[in-house]
Amino acid sequence: TYLQALPYFDRLLNIQPPPREKMFEFYERMHAAYIRPGGVHQDLPLGLMDDIYEFSKNFSLRIDEVEEMLTNNRKTQPYDVYDQVEFDVPIGSRLYTEGYQVPPGATYTAIEAPKGHMLADVVAIIGTQDIVFGEIDR
């Protein structure tokens, strides 16, 4: 729909698509099923190599922007050794409430309960059980 493409419209009226869209265009022109057992499916589409070359010349200018975006998102919930690595993250202001403050010394962390290990899920779990009393002795 048009609504999905809304974030990609810029002041040039979408004359120049974002780099990701361009990479997907290359992928669509040479699909993953291009290489098959016994050889390739067909010749490369006309103009594909020229388009990839032009894209790679222009994309190299945006490498720093992409690196900044990908390396600064590991500070909020670090994993592996990210909490031991020193790097800066831009800090802004919050427009939402802080929520519950855990007292010092108490432990709080985000968890997932995919199997319903939370108390609120007990009613739903019991409701999904189909108890047949004739088979209880088994």
Curated annotation (Swiss-Prot):
Q: Where are the transmembrane segments?
A: none
Tell me the keywords, alphabetical order. 4Fe-4S, Electron transport, Iron, Iron-sulfur, Membrane, Metal-binding, Mitochondrion, Mitochondrion inner membrane, NAD, Oxidoreductase, Respiratory chain, Translocase, Transport, Ubiquinone
Q: Broadest EC class?
A: translocase
Topology of the protein relative to the lipid bilayer: Peripheral membrane protein
Where found?
Mitochondrion inner membrane
Q: Does the keyword Ribonucleoprotein apply?
A: no
Recall the GO molecular function terms of this protein's record: 4 iron, 4 sulfur cluster binding; metal ion binding; NAD binding; NADH dehydrogenase (ubiquinone) activity; oxygen sensor activity; quinone binding
Q: What does this protein do?
A: Core subunit of the mitochondrial membrane respiratory chain NADH dehydrogenase (Complex I) which catalyzes electron transfer from NADH through the respiratory chain, using ubiquinone as an electron acceptor. Essential for the catalytic activity and assembly of complex I. Redox-sensitive, critical component of the oxygen-sensing pathway in the pulmonary vasculature which plays a key role in acute pulmonary oxygen-sensing and hypoxic pulmonary vasoconstriction. Plays an important role in carotid body sensing of hypoxia.
Q: What is this protein called?
A: NADH dehydrogenase [ubiquinone] iron-sulfur protein 2, mitochondrial
Q: Which organism is it from?
A: Mesocricetus auratus
